[in-house]
């Protein structure tokens, strides 16, 4: 259910702001989006898993706050990020 190290490395190579970037807001949003997608698929198969649903809602809230921060700092970067990730907002 969680991301493997290789999946994280692929996301890091795609969304890094600079070469040694491991925790920028863009990268955090990309990782959260991948985890949210996986958890959504899990919940479609297991609708009574309420603990996972709560975790999903927490992740969605964290991603929303990070996206708000990015939008406040640089709206052009925000627009390109949500297009690249395929997020509707």
From Swiss-Prot:
<dbReference type="GO" id="GO:0003735">
    <property type="term" value="F:structural constituent of ribosome"/>
</dbReference>
<keyword id="KW-0687">Ribonucleoprotein</keyword>
<comment type="similarity">
    <text>Belongs to the universal ribosomal protein uS15 family.</text>
</comment>
<dbReference type="Pfam" id="PF00312">
    <property type="entry name" value="Ribosomal_S15"/>
</dbReference>
<dbReference type="InterPro" id="IPR000589">
    <property type="entry name" value="Ribosomal_uS15"/>
</dbReference>
<dbReference type="InterPro" id="IPR005290">
    <property type="entry name" value="Ribosomal_uS15_bac-type"/>
</dbReference>
<comment type="function">
    <text>One of the primary rRNA binding proteins, it binds directly to 16S rRNA where it helps nucleate assembly of the platform of the 30S subunit by binding and bridging several RNA helices of the 16S rRNA.</text>
</comment>
<keyword id="KW-0694">RNA-binding</keyword>
<dbReference type="GO" id="GO:0006412">
    <property type="term" value="P:translation"/>
</dbReference>
<protein>
    <recommendedName>
        <fullName>Small ribosomal subunit protein uS15</fullName>
    </recommendedName>
</protein>
<comment type="subunit">
    <text>Part of the 30S ribosomal subunit. Forms a bridge to the 50S subunit in the 70S ribosome, contacting the 23S rRNA.</text>
</comment>
<dbReference type="InterPro" id="IPR009068">
    <property type="entry name" value="uS15_NS1_RNA-bd_sf"/>
</dbReference>
<keyword id="KW-0699">rRNA-binding</keyword>
<dbReference type="GO" id="GO:0019843">
    <property type="term" value="F:rRNA binding"/>
</dbReference>
<dbReference type="GO" id="GO:0022627">
    <property type="term" value="C:cytosolic small ribosomal subunit"/>
</dbReference>
<keyword id="KW-0689">Ribosomal protein</keyword>
<comment type="function">
    <text>Forms an intersubunit bridge (bridge B4) with the 23S rRNA of the 50S subunit in the ribosome.</text>
</comment>
